[in-house]
């Protein structure tokens, strides 16, 4: 066994009180980390009631059993949370397993497909506790887990840089297109012949009733 505990969430719904402790529901469980922007919050009293069986702590893992099933995240420093519905608290045995490594392992297609293949529900996929507790994983030595985690983080950081570069490039492309259109509309995209008739004179010839405005672009 590589866990100290695997604890189901309370099967009740807690009302969002707008302030207090984060209530981790399945939408707040990302791929590796908690997504706490806009999270529902509860009072100290509700927090204590929902954590009566186990208080989530740093390096614990929270698993989403539904909507969407399969996401898993590690609790970080300063994340004092309680569980919403359809979530599971997993506490790895830290002398045997790195919490981040276990999180990555549970996010692999193999692990996700294995657990979801045992899920129930015709419309909404629901992973049962009975499928989570006996789940087997190959376990490398702790030092190897640390090395794997470091390598994964290195590659993920590189991917983030590429994604940011892609976003920056899209912004530049959009700005450039807007600038080209602006220059074209203002007659500045191609060299202008100083002997060309001013646009305002052309408009007067086309429509004798034309009344010029103060827009300087009609003067060119």
Regions found by a protein language model. Name each.
Residues 88-100, 113, 130-150, 156, ...:
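Proline-centric
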Residues 49, 92, 105, 125, ...:
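Hydrophobic alpha-helical scaffolding
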Residues 70, 105-137:
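Specificity-determining recognition surfaces
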Residues 1-8, 134, 138, 142, ...:
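Non-catalytic DNA-recognition/assembly elements of restriction-modification systems
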Residues 25-26, 41-107, 126:
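A short beta-sheet element
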């Amino acid at each position: 066994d590589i866990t100290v505990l695997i604890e189901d969430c309370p099967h009740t719904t807690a009302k969002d009180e707008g302030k207090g402790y984060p209530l981790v529901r399945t939408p707040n469980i990302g791929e590796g980390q908690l997504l706490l922007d806009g999270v529902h919050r509860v009072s100290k009293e509700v927090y204590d009631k929902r954590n009566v069986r186990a208080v989530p702590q740093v390096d614990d893992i929270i698993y989403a059993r539904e909507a969407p099933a399969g996401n898993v995240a590690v609790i970080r420093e300063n994340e004092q949370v309680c569980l919403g519905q359809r979530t599971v608290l997993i506490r790895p045995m830290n002398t045997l397993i790195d919490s981040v490594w276990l999180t990555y392992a549970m996010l692999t297609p193999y692990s996700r497909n294995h657990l979801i293949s045992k899920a129930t529900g015709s419309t909404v996929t629901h992973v049962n506790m009975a499928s989570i507790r006996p789940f087997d994983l190959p376990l490398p030595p702790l030092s190897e887990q640390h090395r794997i985690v470091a390598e994964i983080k290195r590659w993920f950081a590189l991917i983030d840089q590429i994604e940011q570069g892609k976003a920056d490039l899209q912004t530049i492309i959009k700005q450039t297109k807007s600038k080209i259109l602006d220059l074209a509309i203002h007659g500045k995209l191609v060299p202008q012949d100083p002997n060309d008739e001013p646009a305002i004179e052309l408009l007067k010839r086309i429509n004798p009733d034309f009344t010029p405005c103060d827009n300087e672009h009609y003067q060119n």
